[in-house]
Amino acid sequence: MKILILFGSPKTNGSTAKLTGAFMKGIRKSDDVEIVHLFSLQPTPCNACGYCKAANGCSKKDLEKFMAKLEDADAVIVATPVYNLSFPAPMKALFDRFQRYYEAHFRRKIAQPITKHKKALLLVTAGDDEDDGYNIIEKQVKLSFSVMNTELVGGVLAKDTDNGGVKEDDLRRAFEL
């Protein structure tokens, strides 16, 4: 199974990394896993140029290799902290660039812009003790993935990480996904 992890935290050893690490310990050794660090990838933001309204892809070519990996994956893991009730900027820029699939589906009437069905999971960390950020991110992911032949099937919210980091129960739940 090809698993693509979209890692949205700037901290490679913070709470999101710990939650992602617990998930990775729970997957099969035979799985092919790639972690894409979005703060390193630095997706160029969408500027509404309209290219994807009429053609496949995007006028910006910085994500072509990434999009090919995404389309080929069997599973997509969105691992992100909550920033102001949403994603950090590079994750948001990436999700905005998924507009190419929205336009293909709704404007150009391509039933499944991504032919390979895939499953997705959310691994979300939040410094506070609220569910609001997770709920907003979950809705954004579900709606974006709905035109990408990708089904969100579960997730873990590790909240209150500003007070003691990721809890053992959250690590266990990520491992068991």
At which residue positions do the language-model features occur?
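A short, flexible beta-alpha/helix-coil linker loop
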Residues: 126-129, 159-163
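N-terminal beta1-alpha1-beta2 submodule of the flavodoxin-like/Rossmannoid cofactor-binding fold
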Residues: 1-80, 85-103, 154, 160-177
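Short, glycine-/small-residue-rich phosphate/pyrophosphate-handling segment
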Residues: 107-151
